[in-house]
Amino acid sequence: MPRADRKNITETALIEERAVTAANSIPQGQPVVLAAAGTISLPTALTDQIYGIAYKTEDGTWPATGGDFVEVILIGSPAIVPCRVGTAAGVTAGQIVNVDGGWDGVKNITPGVANVTTPIGMATQTSTVTGELVGVNLGARLGTGT
């Protein structure tokens, strides 16, 4: 592809509108899954708003444990952010992680839950109304977690 035809990934992010299923309140930044008839719902056991995928460690060794730095790809975003493992539990390559409060000026991560249902992207706005359309950023899709 000629260089002039290439676009930054943030310029070409695929946003789709999906209706929220009944009994779901979906906050902005929440990973979401496809439900019946093209609607979206909350993934099983994924409740925090910011999730990512453990991508790379400083020294290339896994698992990363408490205090280690890990680069994390944020779900639904092309962003890769440096985070520090906030617990003694090991984080493995490709694992879904929770990105939570600050620790020494950087974000903590803790091992996420097993990937019970696969998020398709991240909600771009908040919805509390059944059937309301919300944007879903499909920029980063997950494979299977560990």
Q: What residue spans do the PLM features occupy?
A:
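Glycine-anchored, exposed beta-strand/edge motif detector
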Residues: 1-146
